């Protein structure tokens, strides 16, 4: 088992405090610093971290430093932490990697760059602040690591070992590839959600009842529109070229759909929906990236208490649910639950569920 680390967290918002909570739970000593004294005090109360009066005090004896501040300040603080913590691996948690990495390479002392590893935990929420933090924010997520040509591979491996110890899955890739991929699966969804919500709000001026008709689908699609405007402005500008390309691809697909609808090409419309449905169901059913888990598919009727019956059955079997996702049928009346459990518990889970008349089927 990996030995305990001395963790320093610079920036105690949602992600920073969640990392602190995960580290404390894993048995690490944790110090934190934030320029906002109130945020630091709330983070200390929630996570158990020891508050520091300065960045230097926070990182002085750390072995791993997480810089968890807004994107514009990341590079400068990473450079400062590298100098103030001569024995520590220093990483950031920014959603944009190429821009931040190039700034770090330009600003930090070249002698310290072997200890810098760019990072991006693929977790979070539309909520913000230390009061919303939880170790579950990083538990089970993919955590991208982007070393540079100057990074010591041992620094990457040390950070990866810590990430695995707190229950996340490290994935190594270069910064440019990271930015291209997250532009599609992380940044574009935020833009689409924001634009759709803005469109509906504008239409409300002429049609006051439009949002009264907004049901579950609209609410699901616009959840991200409640995210921090300041945070997302920094992210979009920091990854502007990749996001612009993703928007071009997305706009092209929307225009294709418009043309198919106007031309009454029913088969093409149905085919587009079918392909997307198949891809979405495959995404839902995929197991966690981490090894040793299994996914069980369970169709359920739409009635009160059925989900409690399902989870109670697994509780009686002593099976821990690592993840649970629900896909609702468009026709209503039924849904499908996808359960992620430990691979060595999957057979027992299936047996208990079938004994209670659930049609459990192991997918992976």
Where do the model's predicted regions map?
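Residues in the short beta-alpha loop(s) of Rossmann-like NAD(P)-binding domains
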Residues: 35-36, 94, 327
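Rossmann-like NAD(P)(H) cofactor-binding subdomain of soluble oxidoreductases
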Residues: 77-131
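Internal alpha-helical scaffold of NAD(P)-dependent oxidoreductase catalytic cores
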Residues: 36, 137-226
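NAD(P)+-binding Rossmann beta1-loop-alpha1 motif at the extreme N-terminus of oxidoreductases
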Residues: 1-59
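Rossmann-like NAD(P)-binding element
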Residues: 55-89
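A conserved regulatory-domain signal marking ACT and ACT-like small-molecule sensing domains
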Residues: 279-364
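Interdomain hinge/lid region at the active-site interface
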Residues: 206-276
């Amino acid at each position: 088992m990996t030995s305990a680390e001395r963790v320093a967290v610079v920036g105690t918002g949602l992600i920073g405090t969640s990392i602190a909570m995960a580290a404390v739970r894993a048995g690490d000593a944790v110090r934190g610093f934030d320029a906002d004294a109130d945020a630091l005090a709330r983070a200390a109360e929630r996570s158990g971290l020891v508050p520091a009066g300065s960045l230097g005090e926070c990182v002085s004896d750390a072995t791993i430093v997480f810089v968890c501040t807004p994107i514009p300040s990341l590079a400068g603080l990473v450079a400062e932490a590298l100098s103030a913590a001569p024995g520590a691996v220093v990483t950031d948690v920014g959603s944009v990697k190429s821009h931040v990495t190039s700034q770090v390479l330009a600003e930090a002392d070249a002698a310290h760059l072997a200890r810098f590893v760019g990072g991006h935990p693929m977790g979070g929420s539309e909520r913000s602040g230390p009061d919303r933090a939880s170790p579950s924010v990083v538990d089970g997520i993919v955590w991208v690591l982007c070393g540079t040509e100057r990074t010591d591979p041992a620094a990457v491996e040390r950070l990866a070992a810590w990430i695995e110890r707190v229950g996340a899955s490290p994935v190594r890739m270069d910064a440019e590839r990271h930015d291209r991929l997250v532009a599609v699966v992380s940044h574009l969804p935020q833009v689409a959600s924001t634009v759709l919500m803005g469109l509906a709000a504008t239409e409300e001026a002429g049609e006051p009842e439009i949002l009264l008709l907004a049901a579950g689908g609209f609410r699901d699609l616009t959840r991200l529109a409640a995210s921090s405007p300041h945070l997302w402005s920094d992210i979009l500008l920091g990854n502007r070229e990749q996001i612009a390309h993703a928007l071009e691809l997305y706009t092209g697909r929307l225009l294709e759909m418009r043309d198919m609808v106007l031309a009454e090409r029913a088969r093409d419309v149905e085919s587009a929906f079918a392909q997307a449905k198949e891809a979405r169901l495959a995404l839902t059913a995929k197991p966690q990236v981490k090894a040793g888990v299994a996914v069980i598919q369970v169709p359920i009727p739409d009635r009160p208490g059925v989900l409690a019956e399902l989870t109670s059955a697994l509780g009686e079997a002593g099976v821990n649910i690592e993840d649970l996702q629900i896909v609702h049928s468009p026709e209503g009346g039924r849904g499908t639950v996808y359960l992620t459990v430990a691979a060595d518990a999957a057979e027992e889970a299936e047996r208990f569920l079938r004994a209670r008349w659930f049609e459990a089927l192991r997918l992976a």
